[in-house]
């Protein structure tokens, strides 16, 4: 959890429209971040 997932996850919980792919392309996160985003 060293990425901006914590911040995005909080917003996603309310909007329920989280997209790890979009964040990954925008912030170029690591593979671990992508997995966490798709997992939630």
From Swiss-Prot:
Species per Swiss-Prot/TrEMBL record: Saccharomyces cerevisiae (strain ATCC 204508 / S288c) (Baker's yeast)
Name this polypeptide is given: Uncharacterized protein YDR003W-A
Domain of life per record: Eukaryota
